C-alpha cells in the first residue's frame, strides 16, 4: 500500500450470498483510498457479520502492517467508536462522518410526508459557509417547529458534531469529495444488482 493516503473512505455494503440453498444478506466492508495522483484504490475487502469498533481497529492495524503510515482524512459512517479506532492507529487522521449517512438516519425518524421539507431545512447546516454558521443553522432548526416535533433529529447531529464539522475547513471541491462515502456505493454498484447473488463470500472479493 501507499505510505500516505490523502483520503480513505470506509463503509459497508450488503450483498446476497447463497448458503445451503438459501440466499442471505452479508455485509462486505470496504476501504477505498484516494492516492496523491487522484486515483482510487481498493485497500481491502472484509467479510464480517457485525460492524463494530473492534473490527475496524483490526482493519486499521492491518492497513498499517501493509505499509500505510498515515491517513489524512478518513470518511466514515456514524458508527460509535469508529473515530477512536482510526485515531488509535493513525493519530493524526482527521475523521469526517459521512453527511449523507447522518441525513438518512435523521429522515428515518420522520413521517414520509415530512421528509422532503425537513431535508430542505437540514441543507442549511451542511451547506453553511463555515462551522460557526453551520452550528447556528442547527440551533435554528432545533428551535423551529420541525426541530420541536422531531427533537431526535437535532440530537443525532449534536452527538456526531465533532466529526460532522471537519470538512468546513476545506473549499467546495474538497467538501464535495469528502462529505459522503458514495464513492464506495458507486464502486460496489455491480454487486448490488437484483440478479447478483454469490455462492460464497470469497466470490465477492474476487
Set out the residue ranges of the language-model regions:
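Acidic/histidine-rich catalytic cores and adjacent linkers
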Residues: 127-206
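A detector of single, family-specific signature residues
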Residues: 36, 46-56, 61-65, 110-117, ...
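Hydrophobic alpha-helical scaffolding
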Residues: 46-49, 72, 76, 93, ...
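Amphipathic alpha-helical transducer elements in NTP-driven molecular machines
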Residues: 7, 25, 50-57, 76-83, ...
Amino acid at each position: 500500500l501507499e505510505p500516505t493516503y490523502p483520503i480513505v473512505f470506509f463503509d459497508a455494503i450488503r450483498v446476497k450470498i447463497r448458503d445451503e440453498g438459501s440466499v442471505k444478506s452479508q455485509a462486505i466492508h470496504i476501504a477505498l483510498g484516494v492516492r496523491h495522483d487522484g486515483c482510487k484504490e481498493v485497500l481491502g475487502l472484509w467479510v464480517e457479520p457485525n460492524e463494530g469498533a473492534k473490527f475496524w481497529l483490526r482493519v486499521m492495524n492491518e492497513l498499517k502492517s501493509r505499509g500505510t503510515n498515515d491517513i489524512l482524512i478518513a470518511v466514515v459512517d456514524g458508527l460509535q467508536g469508529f473515530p477512536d479506532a482510526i485515531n488509535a492507529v493513525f493519530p493524526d487522521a482527521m475523521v469526517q462522518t459521512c453527511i449523507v449517512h447522518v441525513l438518512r438516519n435523521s429522515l428515518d425518524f420522520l413521517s414520509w410526508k415530512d421528509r422532503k421539507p425537513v431535508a430542505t431545512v437540514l441543507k442549511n447546516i451542511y451547506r453553511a459557509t463555515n462551522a460557526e454558521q453551520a452550528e447556528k443553522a442547527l440551533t435554528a432548526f432545533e428551535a423551529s417547529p420541525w426541530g420541536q416535533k422531531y427533537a431526535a433529529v437535532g440530537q443525532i447531529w449534536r452527538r456526531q458534531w465533532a466529526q460532522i464539522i471537519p470538512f468546513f475547513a476545506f473549499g467546495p471541491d474538497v467538501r464535495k469529495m469528502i462529505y459522503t462515502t458514495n464513492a464506495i456505493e458507486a464502486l460496489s454498484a455491480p454487486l448490488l444488482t437484483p440478479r447478483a447473488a454469490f455462492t460464497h463470500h470469497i466470490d465477492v472479493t474476487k
